[in-house]
Amino acid sequence: MKLTCMMIVAVLFLTAWTFATAEDPRNGLENLFSKAHHEMKNPEDSKLNKRCVKYLDPCDMLRHTCCFGLCVLIACI
């Protein structure tokens, strides 16, 4: 019984958190999914594509952050 109540409270809390942190609370999850769908249709708009480091800029060897080439010491080549 206690576990069931805790699960219900957790689900309600997570649902409220999702709607409270949404950019437009009226659309909630619908807005989130429409953005993801748009990024799938147009991969250039994806945020993941914008995180890479350009040529000769400082990079992170462990995370492979260079757009093209390799990260040697501290710069992308």
From Swiss-Prot:
**Annotated localization:** Secreted
Chief subcellular location equals secreted
Keyword annotations from UniProtKB, A to Z: Disulfide bond, Knottin, Neurotoxin, Secreted, Signal, Toxin
Kindly indicate where the leader peptide sits in this chain: 1-22
Per its record, what are the GO molecular function terms?
Answer: ion channel inhibitor activity; toxin activity
Q: Pfam family of this protein, just one?
A: Conotoxin
Cystine residue pairs: C52-C67, C59-C71, C66-C76
Which residues does the record annotate as propeptide?
A: 23-49
The text the record gives for the protein's domains is: The presence of a 'disulfide through disulfide knot' structurally defines this protein as a knottin. The cysteine framework is VI/VII (C-C-CC-C-C).
* Name listed for the protein in its UniProt record: Conotoxin PnMKLT1-0122
Q: Which organism is it from?
A: Conus pennaceus
